[in-house]
Amino acid sequence: MIPTYMNIMLAFTISLLGMLTYRSHLVASLLCLEGMTMSLFIMTALIASNTHSPLINIMPIILLVFAACEAAVGLALLISISNTYGLDYIHNLNLLQC
């Protein structure tokens, strides 16, 4: 396997392990989730550059749009939780339900 792909897969795996390890704090979970989406973006961009199909060239852009949306929703949740409770624990997300 090409070392570039191995490094990107390693970055995704480390972000996934970080997500599983630091799942109590929202900031750490959001950072790990952002690392996972960035490694997926780089992987799809590399695959799109290697295959010269016009249909796959749009996939990195679509993934980047979804990453921006999840970052915006995550930051909105972080702000609402930290303003309400003063902490960024994920178990406070259950308290936001009506």
From Swiss-Prot:
Belongs to the complex I subunit 4L family. Its EC number is 7.1.1.2. The chain crosses the membrane at residues 1-21, 27-47, 61-81. GO terms for biological process: ATP synthesis coupled electron transport. It is found in: Mitochondrion inner membrane. It catalyses: a ubiquinone + NADH + 5 H(+)(in) = a ubiquinol + NAD(+) + 4 H(+)(out). Core subunit of respiratory chain NADH dehydrogenase (Complex I) which is composed of 45 different subunits. GO terms for molecular function: NADH dehydrogenase (ubiquinone) activity. Keywords: Electron transport, Membrane, Mitochondrion, Mitochondrion inner membrane, NAD, Respiratory chain, Translocase, Transmembrane, Transmembrane helix, Transport, Ubiquinone. InterPro entries: NADH_UbQ_OxRdtase_chain4L/K, NUOK/Mnh_C1-like. It comes from Macaca sylvanus. This is NADH-ubiquinone oxidoreductase chain 4L. Core subunit of the mitochondrial membrane respiratory chain NADH dehydrogenase (Complex I) which catalyzes electron transfer from NADH through the respiratory chain, using ubiquinone as an electron acceptor. Part of the enzyme membrane arm which is embedded in the lipid bilayer and involved in proton translocation. GO terms for cellular component: mitochondrial inner membrane; respiratory chain complex I. It is a multi-pass membrane protein.
